[in-house]
Each structure stands twice: as structure tokens, then as C-alpha cells.
């Protein structure tokens, strides 16, 4: 018997960092994600194979106590073992599902891009084992859970999760008339989401005024019918988060002479930035290549 599951990647458009304190966040599920198949084998073991863009990059075998028998990457097998044990904390009977199977995962995007390699894994595991993915997130990587919501959504979402409460998820439509001038620029430095989450929560207190402003900006961006108005909202959002983090805005840092608007996405300092510009694709590619950045994607091409 073979079971198959799939999870969408994610992109956070508004609310980065403050979504951890209960801000509403606009997030997009992506057409690239991660799939998982579970197939029965004779041995009372868990045989795990992980592929990335068609290539096997990790393989491990766990015994009936979930101890590692064999592994191609001891550090990752330890990390995976911890997640599986966290799943058992929710429901000890899931051990019966974990044994006597071969699990194969297939990541569809470059893991350096920060599109949800961890969140899609948690969602897939939770769907297979029949447990709560948000609880598994809390026990493992931590975070707001918007990425878990994107993993199982077929539409853009507004997402909020207040402390000690269940997530609030509202499906929305995001297809502005100027979407053809929105792009994603990879800043070529993978940020650790879990590390950023921990650092932010350790040093920052709640920001009620900033949260209210970000909520208003997110709603306005969703309704915006003008590329210029949308760009000004991007700029306002960037300024608020910049002041909270005490970090320079990405446009100030790398692209001060750019004709258009640029907003950081996700963990600042790496991952992707949102580009809003009237320049044609060829001119944009040339400009960013001259700055040392070579991966530019249209937003429309990655949205689910």
C-alpha cells in the first residue's frame, strides 16, 4: 500500500516578525512545495529517503525505537529523530504508523530559498500521522504557523495567531491589476527562520501600535488597484519593521538608486525581496545582475 501527500511552499508578503506577536499577515501559498509518499516494507523499521529537485540528498534507517541504525547525515537524522519524537508526544500510537514503512520526500524548490522546507515537512508528517501540525510546530521549530496554513491552502490567506489561541485563517483573493510588475529577487543568503524567531521574541516586547499599522497596511495592499499606491504601502511597511529591528531597509542597503519599490520578505538579511517596478524584465535582470544578484522571478510565476 502506498500513501501520497503534498504541501505548498509559502511566501509572507506582510507582517514579518510582528506576526509572531499577533499581527495579521498576508501570505501566499506557492506552486512549488514538497511531496511525500509512504510505502509498506517488511522490516519493522522506518526507512527515510529525502530528495531535493530530483536528487537524493539524505537517507536514514531508524529501528523500532526510532534510534538511528544508518544515516548519510548524522546531524540531520538527529533533527528528524527529534521531530518524530515530538510527534509521539502528541499521540504515542503514531509509532505504529512510523514502523514498517519507507518514506520518500521530494522538495520541489531550492532549499536555500526559504520557501518552507521545514514547514512543509511538518505539515506532511502531521497529515500522515493524523496529528495537529501547529502543536508539532510549537514543539519543534516554533513560529507563528502561517507557513503551516499556507502548506494546506489553495488560496492566499490572511493569518493571525494570538498567544495561546488557535490560528485565524481567512482565504482572500490577491491578483492586483499590476501583478506583472511584481517580482521576487533572491538575496542569496539563506536565513534561519527558527533562529530569527527566537532572537526576535527574546529581545522585543509587544508592539501594539506597530501591529495595528501593519494590519492596516496589509488590508490596504490587498485592496490596492494602483502599482504606485501599492509601492508606497511597501515602503511604509519596510520603514516600520526597520525601526523595530534597528536594521537598514534592503533598498538603502543594496539598491539606493533603484527605480521602484523594494520590500524585504520573511527573515531580513536573506531570502527574497519583493520588487515593484515599471522597468521591463530585461532591464531589471541587468540592474540586479550588476549588483551581484542573479535570481529574479515574476511573482505570478510562483503563486499557486
Positions of PLM-derived features:
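C-terminal nucleotide
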Residues: 2-8, 19, 35-97, 105-106, ...
